Amino acid sequence: MSLRAFMLCVCLLLQSVGARPASELQNLERLLQDQLSSTEHPEEDRLDRTREEPQLGGSSSREAADESALTRLFADLLRTSKRSWGRYKKGGMRSCFGVRLERIGSFSGLGC
């Protein structure tokens, strides 16, 4: 096959592929447009959600449970980090056999 024929086939193939957008691209474009419109009109979205909530029947309680679980998780992480910070500040690094000792027998935290 000659180079001219090959280039002609490639050009025709690119022309046919590029002539119409793929359905995935159309879906992506539609999603992006929806996202842009939702950021432009947050008041309307809030009104739409309040209208939809009675139809969903309990989604607000599920969302509240998810939010409370997330809040508990973050609160637990904050409490844990404060406790571990206090250990490092007072006693230094912990090892498998307990805390670092300045005097023998001053702590009884031996063991893994």
From Swiss-Prot:
Chief location of this protein within or outside the cell: secreted
Signal sequence residues: 1-19
Tissues expressing this chain: Spinal cord, kidney, ovary, heart and spleen, and to a lower extent in brain and liver.
Covalent S-S links between cysteines: 96-112
Gene Ontology terms describing biological process: blood vessel diameter maintenance; cGMP biosynthetic process; receptor guanylyl cyclase signaling pathway
Pfam families given in the database record: ANP (PF00212)
GO molecular function: hormone activity; hormone receptor binding
SMART domains per the UniProt record, alphabetical: NAT_PEP
Any single Gene Ontology cellular-component annotation: extracellular region
Record keywords, A-Z: Cleavage on pair of basic residues, Disulfide bond, Hormone, Secreted, Signal, Vasoactive
Propeptide section residues: 20-90
Function: Exhibits natriuretic and vasodepressant activity. Has cGMP-stimulating activity. May help to regulate body fluid homeostasis in a variety of aquatic environments.
Family affiliation: Belongs to the natriuretic peptide family.
Protein name: C-type natriuretic peptide 3
Gene label: cnp-3
